[in-house]
């Protein structure tokens, strides 16, 4: 009997570590962010019929999402993790962009050396400054109306249109990322997006028959201490080709580069000030047989936020610089500046539920066509959204619930 008892204890001790290693955690989470808003874009420089977007009301589901994530302890300081996050269109229930794992989703490993993931995820360039925007770059208030933009909507799936291929606010498909551990407030991320051109006829809108192989390289470094946050980031898009489609010309090799810096200071959770500056450069090696072509733009953004009790107020201003064009017979594009002014008031009903009111306006010069980056107005002219010189304006009321 004593021998049997000892055997049972021994078996339990052997099984215990294996059971512990197999334990995992699973979390179901989500954000429901819906508003009713009035939007318009008037004042088009073209004067053509249909070049303006007349005022109308709409209900918008601003990046609402549902997700599942978890970890598994593998022992010896190593863990596996996963996340499956999908967009939820509460405004109309459509599946446009709202399919399984359509948002940040992946699987990977975490250790003392940092973590690595495979899947689809926001680029380090995008992540580096998104926290400086009080909205998290959501809806018509998002700073991607200016930052990361050339009059382009954000790219959720690596990009299939001109506008998306030109954007530097990207969720990158077919990506491998490395995130470093934090050391004395310093941390970094690196990413490589494959472009996945080996199967099918197109990737990122580039024909496989052209022989080009699109790829993305992105990296960031950030420092956080006390109330300070500072970051620098860079990103290159190889052969994304946002130009030749305009001229119906044979596609040629090229690259697009983005460089960005951001800083934020927060004081006692009462107020915060932030600023972002970036330089975007688009380069085609040989456009329409006329030689190399470059397009350069400098954008910047400033924001202030004040919190008192359940109330919060945020004001922001962003500006897109004039476009500098060179090569292939092009010269600088005059009247191509734009700016965006945004105001937002929030009221917290609880830790997970809040109401908000907002207003925003983008002022486009005659040759500019900036639009709301994450909730654009319907396209009216070629890839331009809205028409050249039209000024998108919006205001409304909304509600956010998280779980």
Model-inferred region functions:
Residues 1-22:
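Gram-negative bacterial Sec-dependent N-terminal signal peptides
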Residues 15, 69-73, 110-112, 179-184, ...:
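Structural signature of outer-membrane beta-barrel channels/translocons
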Residues 24-37, 54-196, 221-226, 360-364:
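Outer membrane beta-barrel
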Residues 26-34, 76, 80-84, 116, ...:
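Transmembrane beta-strands of outer-membrane beta-barrel proteins
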Residues 36-44, 88-94, 124-128, 196-200, ...:
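Gram-negative outer-membrane beta-barrel proteins
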Residues 65-67, 104-106, 175-177, 218-220, ...:
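Membrane-embedded beta-strand positions in outer-membrane beta-barrel channels/transporters
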Residues 212, 217-347, 359-361:
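Detector for outer-membrane/organellar transmembrane beta-barrel domains
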Residues 387-403:
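Outer-membrane beta-barrel "beta-signal"
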């Amino acid at each position: 009997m004593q021998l049997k008892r000892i055997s049972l204890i021994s078996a339990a001790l052997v099984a215990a570590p294996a059971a512990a290693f197999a334990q995992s955690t699973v979390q179901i989470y989500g954000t429901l962010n819906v508003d009713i808003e009035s939007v318009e874009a008037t004042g088009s420089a073209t004067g053509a019929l249909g070049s303006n977007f007349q005022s109308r009301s709409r209900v918008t589901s601003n990046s609402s999402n549902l997700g599942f994530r978890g970890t598994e302890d593998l022992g010896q300081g190593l863990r596996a993790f996963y996340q499956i996050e999908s967009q939820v269109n509460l405004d109309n229930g459509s599946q446009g962009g709202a399919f399984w794992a359509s948002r940040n989703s992946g699987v990977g490993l975490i250790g003392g050396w940092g973590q690595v993931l495979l899947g689809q995820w926001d680029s380090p360039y995008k992540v580096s400054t998104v926290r400086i925007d009080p909205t998290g770059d959501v809806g018509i208030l998002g700073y991607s109306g200016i930052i990361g933009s050339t009059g382009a909507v954000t790219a959720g799936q690596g990009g299939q249109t001109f506008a998306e291929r030109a954007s530097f606010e990207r969720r990158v498909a077919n990506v491998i990322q490395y995130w470093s551990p934090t050391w004395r407030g310093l941390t970094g991320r690196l990413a490589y997006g494959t472009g996945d051109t080996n199967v099918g006829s197109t990737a990122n809108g580039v024909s496989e028959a052209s022989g080009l192989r699109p790829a993305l390289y992105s990296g960031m470094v950030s420092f956080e201490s006390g109330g300070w946050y500072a970051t620098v980031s860079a990103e290159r898009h190889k052969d994304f080709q946002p130009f030749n489609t305009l001229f119906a010309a044979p596609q040629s090799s090229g690259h697009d580069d983005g460089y960005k810096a951001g800083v934020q200071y927060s004081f006692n959770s009462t107020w915060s000030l932030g600023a972002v500056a970036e330089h975007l450069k688009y380069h085609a090696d040989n456009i329409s047989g006329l030689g190399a072509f470059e397009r350069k733009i400098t954008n910047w953004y400033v924001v202030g936020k004040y919190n008192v009790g359940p109330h919060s107020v945020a004001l922001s201003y962003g500006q897109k610089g004039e476009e500098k064009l060179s090569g292939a017979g092009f010269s600088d594009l005059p009247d191509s500046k734009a700016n965006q002014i945004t105001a937002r008031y929030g009221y917290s009903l609880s830790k997970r539920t809040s109401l908000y009111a907002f207003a925003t306006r983008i002022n486009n010069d005659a040759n500019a066509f900036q639009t709301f980056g994450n909730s654009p107005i319907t396209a009216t002219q070629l890839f331009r959204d809205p028409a050249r010189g039209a000024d998108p304006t919006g205001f409304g009321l909304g509600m956010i619930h998280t779980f």
